[in-house]
Amino acid sequence: DSDGTTLNICRAAGPGLNAQSDCMILKYFGHGTQIVAEEASDGKTYIWLNSNASVDKSGEYGDNWSVSRVEFVPGATSDAGYAGETFFLNKDGQYDQQVSIDFGARRLLIGSRRSGVRYFWIFDLDEALALPLKKMTATVTVGSAGSEPVTREIEARDLNDCRVLGGFSVPAGSDKENDVYSYSHQGHEVAGNYVYFYEGNAVETGADSFESKAYVTVFNYSGKIVVPRTEVAAVADKAGLAPRDLRPRAMPRARV
């Protein structure tokens, strides 16, 4: 859950139980487009998510420069904009960095964007975790509508020093019926040797509710399409959702 500045990371103890009783608050980390939960071998739970975000004119934090691996501690609050282990992609000014992990295959995917193009970088997860810490800087804007630039010096891991297993880019399309990435980016996933790219309408309210369009395209690590762009259902079954009391409400705007 997010209000543009704060991410509420909640964990339900079991079916039908209130997740709000097991919640951690992260402030100024970013949009929270992609969040990964890790049940680690040390018995702890870690949350992977975007970090080091800037505030825009609407007061919402996004366009982040890194991802962080944060230990999940119920009741804790972090307001530094990053925490735990932080990873910078550090490639050609690419920002809006979003994480996906296949723990079984030990694959780490970082998605990013720049100048209307989406980029996808795949790493060996264990090699990324073993990168040495080094001092890195991130300049972000905070305060009222981005009025205060802040430069942070952070002990972090530089993914630019990590072996790249695969990488490719996807330019924005214009034909919504046919072009990959002609709708807003809504998420991505790495699974084995493949990357799943999810695009679709931002959340709509009012007359446009439940008229969502959404598509998934599957790529290999070199960017070749192995499963063509396929339409999928996303908040489109109005009749099926209504009995479950799932109704439209205002949401933060989507990132493109």
Question: What are these model-derived regions, one by one?
Answer:
Residues 1, 31-45, 49-50, 54, ...:
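Structural signature of eukaryotic scaffold interfaces centered on beta-propeller domains
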Residues 1-32:
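N-terminal carbohydrate-binding/catalytic regions of secreted carbohydrate-active enzymes
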Residues 1-4, 42, 52-59, 114-118, ...:
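Short glycine/acidic-enriched loop and turn motifs that connect beta-strands
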Residues 4-16, 59-76, 117-147, 209-226, ...:
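Beta-propeller blade signature
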Residues 18-27, 77-91, 130-176, 225-243:
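Beta-propeller fold detector
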Residues 28-33, 57-104:
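Asp-box/WD-like beta-propeller blade repeats and closely related beta-sheet repeat scaffolds
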Residues 39-44, 71-80, 101-107, 127-133:
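Secondary-structure boundary elements
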Residues 163, 167-243:
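Loop/turn-rich, solvent-exposed surfaces of beta-rich toroidal or solenoidal domains
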